[in-house]
Design a protein with these regions (language model features):
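Secretory-pathway/membrane protein signature
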Residues: 1-244
């Protein structure tokens, strides 16, 4: 998914799940970086679209049909089709990348607490889906509770303060990093501070403020992952008050 797309604010600021759809033929796949070079310019007009890209709007019609079918499928699904184990794997991959790049840098970060938080989230995701598979599907409120937890999970990854270099980006896992990273993908806030730290190595500038920001955001990241895992815990409904 294009992390800097026009819809990025939905998940990076508001924690709202999004889906990205596009059409690429064989030619456009080879030119994927310039498939629509006039996008977001003054030449991005409906007339140019008809003249050069989709004269009969056939592609737009097909994509709209796919989108409509997706909406129908979501509406008909008993549970939101979110696999939290995929999210757990993403966190594991980001941690692994961080472990590799931070291992050779004198950062003083205790990576074991992040490892523990990621493992805790993985266990919580597995337990959540296990409960989901054994749920009484005749209980509409039980289904509602599970779907609410699935839908609101993204918001558990929001930090009200935002990323260290961009307070408007609140999602500490999926927000795009500010700086172009020349390393493997890591957590966005960590990536930004890591790149700043590397850029200043060997320079006369004092690195302690950068290191302090890195440590502060790192511990906030760990705390947020723990809270996200807690949000997947079983929700016990209040007992009904017996009538007299």
């Amino acid at each position: 998914m294009e992390m800097n797309g026009g819809y990025a604010a939905f998940f990076s600021r508001a924690g709202i799940p999004v889906v990205h759809m596009s059409y690429l033929d064989d030619v456009m796949r080879k030119l994927s970086s310039v498939a629509f070079p006039v996008k977001h310019t003054q030449y991005d007009t409906f007339q140019r679209l008809q003249d050069h890209f989709d004269p009969e709007l056939k592609v737009h019609a097909r994509v709209a049909q796919v989108a409509g079918e997706l909406v129908r499928d979501l509406s008909d699904s008993l549970f939101l089709p979110f696999n939290l184990l995929d999210y757990a794997q993403l966190l594991r991959d980001l941690y692994f990348s961080l472990h590799i790049h931070m291992g050779s840098l004198g950062h003083g970060l205790d990576l074991s607490i992040l490892d523990s938080a990621v493992q805790n989230f993985s266990a919580a995701a597995f337990a959540f889906h296990l409960r989901q598979s054994n749920l009484d599907t005749s209980d509409p409120m039980a289904i509602r509770r599970v779907n609410d937890q699935l839908l609101l999970l993204e918001r558990a990854f929001l930090d009200p303060v935002g990323l260290p270099q961009n307070p408007y980006k609140k999602h500490i896992v999926l927000s795009p990093a500010e700086s172009p990273a020349y390393v493997d993908e890591m957590f966005p806030g960590i990536t930004d501070e890591f790149m700043r730290f590397l850029d200043q190595l060997g320079a006369p500038e004092d690195l302690r403020p950068h290191a302090a920001t890195l440590h502060k955001h790192y511990h906030l990241l760990v705390q947020t992952l723990v809270q996200a895992a807690d949000s997947l815990a079983e929700v016990v409904p209040p007992q009904a008050t017996p009538s007299h």
